[in-house]
Amino acid sequence: MRYVCSLSVFALCVSLSLVAAPLRLYVSPAGNDDWPGTTPRRGWFHKKGPFRTLARARDEIRQRRAAGQLPAEGAIISVRKGTYELAEPFALTEADSGPDGGRIVYRASGKDDVRLLAGRLVTAFSPVPADRLARIPKVAQPHVVQCDLRALGLTDFGQPTSGGIQLFFDGRPLPRSRYPNKGFIKVTGVSDRDTKVSHGRKGSKYGEIWFKDPRGKRWAGESDLWTHGYWFWDWSDQRHKVVEFDPKEGRMLFAKPFHGYGYRKGAWFYVYNCLSEIDEPGEWQLDTATGILTFWPPKNPAKAEVFVSVLPKVVSLEKTSKVTLHGFTLAGARGTALTASGVDNVRIETGTIRNCGGGGISLSGRDSQVIGCDLYNLGSHGISLNGGDRKTLTKGNLLAENNHVYHYALVDRVYRPGISLHGVGNVARRNLINDAPHMAMGFGGNDHLIELNEIHSVCYESNDAGAIYTGRDWTQRGTVLRNNYLHDISGFEGKGCMGIYLDDMFSGTTIEGNLFVNVTRAAFIGGGRDNTIDNNIFIDCRPAVHVDARGVGWAKGAVPGVMTQRLEASPYMTALWKQRWPQLQTILDNDPGLPKGTLIARNISVGGRWSNIEGKARPCVTLKDNLVDEDPGFVNAKKGDYRLRQDSPAKAIGFRPIPFGKIGLYQDKLRASWPVSDPVRPSQAPPPAAVRKKGQGPTYKVAHVQPGSIQIDGKASDWRLDPKQAMVCGVPACGEASKYKSLAWLACDGKALYLLVKTPVDPTKPLKTGDTWGQEDAFEFAFRDLSAKKSPIFNLRGYAGGQSSSVCDAGASPQQAEAVDKAMTYAATRAGDSWLGEFRVPLAACGIKAGAERLAFNLNIRRMADNSWMVWQITGGPVWDVDYAGVLLLK
């Protein structure tokens, strides 16, 4: 019996030892590709040991698969600590996929210990010759060194734009020499060739500009001078090589292609790659004709690691499946570090992707994940995921989770998000994204989920931008943005950007359970329909929610244009889509330019401003059960604890708790680093104390006149024009200030309000006398009766050509606006060096009772000659938001 038991145990041990296991291969910097790669260390007589390269391990797996010797469980390739300089990108194809029952796992031995380097280390530095040294500022001359990159075998330097060579020093990218070192130079003039006007802004499509800065004299003789600018809009940039430069005139001519949006006065730019501007440690310049790189090292380069980017990428996967890349550091690519195209069941985890001239990860396919990675110091985007089929609404099931993406878009500055989702049914969850000049996240397609992410300190170099952005489509519906935390986002120079930006009629999106703190235009609906803003908390946002009706206003041309084109290009008429989104079937017959189906419910708004809803949009918006400017009963708002107490009045409106403890990064065995540091970038916005509180603006005493004493003829003969009694429109609502200041006088006879506006005219430029708001010389004023609660804001416009209108933009109903339009009287004339506009507005037509004492009021001057908008009072929002402007005293 004892003998039988012993045999049984022996048989069991033998059978367990024969159970199949993954193939084990090893790679080490001390290895050799002639060794078998099956042991982690070198054996006796150098006959065994690890491989030297990943490519050799990959090829070994291919050979074993072909010979039928690859286990069904796949393979694990363990890569020892060290830096692996790549001669070419590490490429995996369909032939490198895992077997049906297993995976191929490439595993680094430790976090941040295994680096795949697509760059070339630089060790040979020499003094700068006297002729070149003389061009360098004296402060830098004792410190600069140079390196001949051609001596390293490099001949392709690219251009100093996206995809060009970059320099890295001890783990951080160094900036090309530039002026100014921080900030920008303003464009003072553009060419008169190929002129254009866009949204009232004049410019030129020809790439020639003028500027005024005495520093420009230094740049004469620069062999490879470049500029980087936001040439027309602050959300569109381009880099230009300078082909002609006149330092006396401050004139530059750029190489083609010119910027698609053209160039305008007041745009901003800087120059770079100048030998004469190496004036700070870390700055460098490359002469592409000679391959000489000159730089001021932050410290002794002999005691640092210095490398330049060389290869277009570090790793590529093409139609690969069932592969894991675990724990690698990827660096030194000129383009995107890791590209994965058409992959299935691929995992990229615990990685560090940094110091690349392009993006971090671009992945398309299905059922794949990017988990626990750190991505930073990137020239372009962070993580791009694209998967799923819109025709069948089949989900891609791509996931980005627990990643930290920061300090990206260093070269390509705009529309390079930290994380983007495209296709159908992909997820971005519990990521942290911070420190970027433009957007944090972007999405397009259907049915994505963006949840539990933290975003801050983005859009710091842009204004018409969104921390989370999408736009211009009725059909890309079904995405949910929930339980995210957006904070400290205020735009370039504090002029304001957007938190979640549904641009240009984007539709069918749900924004729920998010926390917005100190975000301008936090939840922004740009004319789209069937959007929901529900159960969010807004703290010190200006405003919390925005809805406009651009589809029946300035963007109405897009309705029969790009919007209809994209509708017809989608499968919206298929049975599946008809069932899922029946609204699309009749959209073209249902006022498609209006934001119908907008729901704003159960939100909490504290501080800042609650809403900015355009008048034409108001009938399309359902506002209900929102808690505005009441104490919601936070646990400890001063310390950032926005949980609700048990006695919170928000519970009465059905507010659902937000899972604050689950937002953002979390400690996990797959996290590349822990803990994480992410300091908030200093705000460019004015401090809260500088923003006027509601109803606390300055006052203007209206003159009393006898009925009939003022005739509306566009002349000033009936007025006492004392400059000391004038209302002055002297501050810009946006853009550059005008050198001219318009003056206004107001009077009241007990039955009507009178307004005379005197606007100086530029003698060198004719008045624009049409009736299109924003495109003509005109003014607008807005007012409401402060003695009546929830009284409408009336918004009237007068044009230099004599036309006038009463509009609904500020919230008056169409019937109310029409009643005022019929009752008011307006005239305009040209008088010497000014034009005059004169209004009479019967108070009864506005529903204002006799004896009213105070009107909230603001005045806005549109001057086309210098493309300015000058106002009486800054509101921190729309000019017509008169509760934050000034007050007329009628008595």
Where are these regions (language model features)?
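General beta-strand recognition
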Residues: R115, R251-L253, I292-T294, A522, ...
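Extracellular polysaccharide-degrading/modifying enzymes targeting complex plant/algal/animal polysaccharides
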Residues: P22-R347, T352-R354, S362, K556-Q579, ...
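Bacterial N-terminal signal peptides
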Residues: S6-S17
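Short, surface-exposed charged micro-motifs
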Residues: K241-E244, E283-Q285, A440, L743-W745, ...
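Structural preference for beta-rich elements and adjacent junctions enriched in aromatics
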Residues: A689-K891
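Positively charged n-region of N-terminal signal peptides that target proteins for export
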Residues: M1-V4
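Glycine- and acidic/polar-rich repeat regions and solenoidal domains
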Residues: P89, P99, G335-T339, R354, ...
